[in-house]
């Protein structure tokens, strides 16, 4: 993949797409777990420190995850022990670098924690684009919701959204 960055229409990327769960943990994770069970989800990918920590605390180890080791809540997050491999990448805010694309491509196979120097938020798009069928990508919305994206339902919409990103 190539490097992409947000140049305009940031509003399109801030909207809480697909399923927004406006509940605190552990209820939010129960809702997402029920959704995954109901639809036969085989892989769950998490993006974000708090989301990943909450899944692990609830006893659900994601297939793979991306974190930047920074949280708005200032919570310490240690999740590297649950993953077979750690990949470190540089990914500035608003970007998906080639290095980050490559890490996500490897991570969709499972067992990978991507540690991002910069910001991991945009990697949710890369996971949605590359995850296998029957996958769920979960991330936190800045206003407090847990967002769950059924990859099979939204991959085409994300492909269209990626067209708004500028090559870098």
UniProtKB/Swiss-Prot annotation:
UniProt-listed InterPro entries: GTP-dep_dephospho-CoA_kin (IPR007164)
One of the GO BP terms on file: coenzyme A biosynthetic process
Catalytic reaction annotation: 3'-dephospho-CoA + GTP = GDP + CoA + H(+)
Keyword Iron: no
Pathway in which this enzyme or protein is active: Cofactor biosynthesis; coenzyme A biosynthesis
MF terms in GO: GTP binding; kinase activity
Superkingdom assignment: Archaea
Residues bound to GTP: 49-51, 68, 70, 120
Transmembrane segments annotated in the record for this chain: none
Entries under Pfam families matching the protein: DUF359
EC number: 2.7.1.237
Keyword entries, A-Z: Coenzyme A biosynthesis, GTP-binding, Kinase, Nucleotide-binding, Transferase
Record PANTHER family: GTP-DEPENDENT DEPHOSPHO-COA KINASE, UPF0218 PROTEIN TK1697
Described purpose of this protein according to its UniProt entry: Catalyzes the GTP-dependent phosphorylation of the 3'-hydroxyl group of dephosphocoenzyme A to form coenzyme A (CoA).
Entry's family note: Belongs to the GTP-dependent DPCK family.
This protein's name: GTP-dependent dephospho-CoA kinase
């Amino acid at each position: 993949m190539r490097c992409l960055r947000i140049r305009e229409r940031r509003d399109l990327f801030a909207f809480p797409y697909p399923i927004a769960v406006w509940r605190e943990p552990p209820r939010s994770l129960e809702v997402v777990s029920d959704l995954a069970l109901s639809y036969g989800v085989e892989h769950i990918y998490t993006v974000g420190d708090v989301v990943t920590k909450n899944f692990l605390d609830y006893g659900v180890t994601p297939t793979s995850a991306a974190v930047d080791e920074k949280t708005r809540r200032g919570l310490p997050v240690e999740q590297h022990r649950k993953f077979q491999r750690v990949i470190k990448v540089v990914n500035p805010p608003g970007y998906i670098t080639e290095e980050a694309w490559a890490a996500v491509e490897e991570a969709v196979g499972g067992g990978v924690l991507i540690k991002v120097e910069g910001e991991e938020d945009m990697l949710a798009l890369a996971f949605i684009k590359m995850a296998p069928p029957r996958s769920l990508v979960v991330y936190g919305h800045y206003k407090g919701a847990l967002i769950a994206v059924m990859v099979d339902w939204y991959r085409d919409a994300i492909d269209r959204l990626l067209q708004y990103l500028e090559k870098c």
